[in-house]
Amino acid sequence: MSESAQAVVVNIPDEVVTQSRVRYFELPLGAGTMALITLDNGKDHTRPSTFGPAGLASLNTALDEIAARTDIAAVGITGKPFIFAVGADLSAMSMVNDPRIIAAFGNLGHDVMRRFGEF
């Protein structure tokens, strides 16, 4: 993660963090392994999972873990029961007054999501 992205994570201390957990499943007929990322912020469905800076960092770490393997044939992503995710954590950004941090947050989101195209 870039230095500016790390600054975004440090500057949002009260974020409800969406964790990205990876499980692996062997595909039939020797087709390889599927990595399944589950997004969950630890809250019930009334607080949907969002992507704040630390949540994006967690997703980025999960993608790093998957990218380090040579047996991955498919990557899937799912959410907690009843809801997938609603997008950027705008409540976290409402606490930020520095436009450079807000821009870094947007760049971080684009950088992490772009990685899905690398698989």
Question: Where in the sequence are the language-model features?
Answer:
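Conserved CoA-thioester-binding segment of acyl-CoA-metabolizing enzymes
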Residues: 1-78, 114
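Glycine- (often His-adjacent) and acidic-residue-rich active-site loop
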Residues: 41, 50, 78-114
